[in-house]
């Protein structure tokens, strides 16, 4: 379906955005941009029923996931020592699989008779993850990186 092709195009666009537009920005700005693209895509899917807006939403979702996931991958890889990076990579991949499986499983439980509820749940998850990143993860990551360099 074209929707998934638009997500794939969004992933490719996120590579160019990360390389050229966000290359000189902070990690925090990248996460905020990625989460903003995710929120915009979810809101577009929730409030519009046209085919073209669903393709634009898919593009925004691909951009948001691409930027956010790559930033989390950098965090998971840069924290461990050299010989522990394989474990960090495997942990990251397992967390992706658990997240996808949990999303498929809980989507059917939470949204049984109300299919539009999934948009609001996803929006809540995006907001909570951004707040957690801003308040906990970002500070913890940079504190650990300073300890690692000492």
Predicted regions and their residues:
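Loop-to-transmembrane helix entry
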Residues: 1-10
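C-terminal transmembrane helical hairpin of 12-TM major facilitator-type secondary transporters
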Residues: 26-72
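Helix-to-coil boundary motifs at intracellular loop junctions of multi-pass secondary transporters
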Residues: 24, 75-80
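A late C-terminal transmembrane helix in Major Facilitator Superfamily
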Residues: 79-115
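Helix-to-loop junctions at the C-terminal end of transmembrane segments
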Residues: 13-28
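Multi-pass alpha-helical transporter architecture, strongest
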Residues: 116-150
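Signature of the 12-TM Major Facilitator Superfamily
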Residues: 2, 32-33, 87-91
